[in-house]
């Protein structure tokens, strides 16, 4: 869908035209009051559930072991298929679920690989630097164009959870509930550092060409692959890696004394993830999304440094789900949000699930999240 009006951005620029790629699941009620917006993480897209009409060459299902754990990834199964559908956490027998590709994306929504109307060429580094708030304003404009004024809920994990929180702050009168999973009120310095390493890996690849690699026949695949390796390590926990790979060798019964080949299973896994990712994701989009993650800070943006003040206007019921082994977005961040909301007398429910997979738990622990979300959406939470 092409938005009818320009999108105003935090950097001071206006972006137009803006196209938003989206998918929907379920049936919109006559009163248009059963809409749930689901928001994807850094490398996701609008295809959240079901089988893609045109299966992608590579799976878009992120998550440790999630890429083909049910044998359907090659068919293009949506990244949150286990959570969206009849009888699932986001029950399409009750709700009309909408999923969009984020502003700045590379899966159909306007981003750095889109044509700049001023030149007819891809924006590249001339695309404006965006924030999570810009993504949410774009979603709001998109829903306006669909004729949807109010949301029953906004839900997402990781960056998607940040968007849910941003919705509650920016549009307090337009969303009834939020479900923020494996998220945080602000990325902590360690997470910022890992993001910086990933971005540097891309920008130091000579094939990046200052971000103007489109149409040149070259792309920063080496740097992008390195960024993906870094990302995957941050998504996992040490016990999960040890359980899956231990120190098993990949191709031999003994070491080969080579510098260039992946001799251990864990090395081969990371190389495979890198190779798959560069086939389906744009390096500039990765840079823009990573920067938006780093900027996100509710207390700084809306509370003068106080999270409590930033959340003072929130009216949505809030469900927070965190995971014990998630060191990238640790449970303490969700606990801080819950504490601030409760101090303000606002309804907030938090669950910390004991699970070993690290940040990827939000994609892997669907069965344990489902009853929590169903109760929250069905019975008003706590």
Pin down the residues of each PLM region.
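N-terminal cap/lid subdomain of alpha/beta-hydrolase-fold enzymes
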Residues: 23, 31-116
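Conserved acidic catalytic loop of the alpha/beta-hydrolase fold
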Residues: 120-126, 133-153, 162
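Conserved hydrolase catalytic core segment
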Residues: 150-193
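Acidic catalytic loop of the alpha/beta-hydrolase fold
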Residues: 276, 296, 325-329
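Catalytic active-site module of serine/aspartate enzymes centered on a nucleophile-bearing elbow/loop
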Residues: 335-382
């Amino acid at each position: 869908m092409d938005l009818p009006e320009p999108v105003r951005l935090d950097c001071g620029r206006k972006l137009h035209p803006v196209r938003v790629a989206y998918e929907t699941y379920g049936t919109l009620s006559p009163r248009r009051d059963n809409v749930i917006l689901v928001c994807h993480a850094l490398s996701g897209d609008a295809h959240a559930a079901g089988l893609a009409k045109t299966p992608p060459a590579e799976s878009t299902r992120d998550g440790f072991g999630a890429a083909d754990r049910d044998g359907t990834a090659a068919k293009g199964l949506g990244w949150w298929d286990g959570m969206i559908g009849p009888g699932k956490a986001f029950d399409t027998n009750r709700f009309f679920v909408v999923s969009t590709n984020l502003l700045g994306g590379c899966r159909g929504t306007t981003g750095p690989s889109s044509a700049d109307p001023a030149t007819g060429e891809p924006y590249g580094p001339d695309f404006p630097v965006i924030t999570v708030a810009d993504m949410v304003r774009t979603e709001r404009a998109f829903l306006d164009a669909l004729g949807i004024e109010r949301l029953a809920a906004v839900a997402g994990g990781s960056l998607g959870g940040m968007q849910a929180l941003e919705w509650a702050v920016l549009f307090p009168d337009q969303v009834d509930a939020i479900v923020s999973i494996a998220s945080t009120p602000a990325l902590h310095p360690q997470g910022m550092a890992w993001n910086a390493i990933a971005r540097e890996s891309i920008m130091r690849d000579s094939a990046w060409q200052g971000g103007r690699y489109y149409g040149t026949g070259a792309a920063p695949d080496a740097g992008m692959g390195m960024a993906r390796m870094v990302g995957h390590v941050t998504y996992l926990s040490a016990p999960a890696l040890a359980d899956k790979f231990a120190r098993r060798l990949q191709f031999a019964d003994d070491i080969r004394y080579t510098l260039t080949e992946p001799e251990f299973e864990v090395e081969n896994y990371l190389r495979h993830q890198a190779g798959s990712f560069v086939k389906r994701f744009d390096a500039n989009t990765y840079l823009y999304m990573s920067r938006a993650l780093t900027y996100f800070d509710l207390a700084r943006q809306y509370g003068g440094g106080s999270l409590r003040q930033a959340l003072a206007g929130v009216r949505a019921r809030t469900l927070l789900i965190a995971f014990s082994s998630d060191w990238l977005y640790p449970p303490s961040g969700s606990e801080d949000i819950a504490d601030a909301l409760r101090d303000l007398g606002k309804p907030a429910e938090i669950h910390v699930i004991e699970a070993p997979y690290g940040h990827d738990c939000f994609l892997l622990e669907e069965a344990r999240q489902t009853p929590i979300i169903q109760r929250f959406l069905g019975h008003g939470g706590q």
